[in-house]
Amino acid sequence: MFQKALPALLRSDKVLKRAADANVEQSDFDTSLKDAADTIDKIRNAGPGVGQSELSDRIGDLLLSIVNASRIAGVNSEESLNYATKKFINRFELQEQMASVKDAE
């Protein structure tokens, strides 16, 4: 029914779009963001003693809410994540270069 060979981000976007097209998923942008915020609160309130399985489940829910908000807003979540990763890499490489210069002094 749903391709499992796709990367998780792309797969979740396609599943959410299909659910929306079938009128199964009725959430709007604000609801998706509220779902994400609620999930963050659950993760935060669970504390450090929460099990890995429960934490993994909640983070998965968070990611799905974010992908849904992106889809509703017409933003390609794959491209957004790639761009954010590229920005992080640029900052990280700059920090490495600055540390290298400082070590050389």
Give each language-model segment a name.
Residues 1-59, 63-105:
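Flexible "arm" and connector segments at domain edges
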